[in-house]
């Protein structure tokens, strides 16, 4: 069995074909970079990601043809909070607002007055890196784009849509939006009201590791892979990183350093208070 795994980072995309023993049979990558217009404005053309996805899948397909192998399953993990408003065909209406973009800082400052409710429901306090405040900023500053948007994707559901045609998002990405109730695992009506986001702009939620759909004819024609390959959402890149480093039990912690740096730990219960602390 050949399992094709995509890892969509901020500065490159990697694709690796693994066998059923998790041994790497082949791997390919494409480099790219966001555009930094200023210290607060950071964007990227979403078509760069789609092209990289197709190019890597085509490389894997060519390798499989030469080696008499076959892709039987696809899984994808990606950066988590860059947003992409798309039309009903899944085509971008503007450049992606990257996770490093801080033009939503005024929105966050205003919403921080609601931190009590937001923390209790979403598990995190308002921060410009998360996608919900980026959506609120888009609605306030570019209302025509927001109005035209059939969905507001993050990078993962944008690419998964172009493989399967399904509008779904796994909960590891939604947990970084401030719009999902961390206790119910559902979009929360109170949080949606606070941020001013309509539920129909968001994708249906699934669990990480759940079947997202199957490769469609358009993807197959663009990559020379077959139709009907099951496609799974592996979860957000940092959650997958933690699992890959053996972080399974309460008390386990790991440090990841890439374009961003993270300290990640496991807890069995959601903390009651997640406010930041300092000596002062």
What are these regions (language model features)?
Residues 1-94, 120, 148, 203, ...:
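N-terminal glycine/serine-rich phosphate-binding loop of ATP-dependent small-molecule kinases
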Residues 276-280:
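Conserved small/polar residues in nucleotide/adenosyl-binding loops
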Residues 3-7, 71-76, 152, 230-244, ...:
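Short glycine-aspartate micro-motif
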Residues 101:
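Carbohydrate-associated surface elements
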Residues 106-111, 241-243:
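Pocket-flanking alpha-helical
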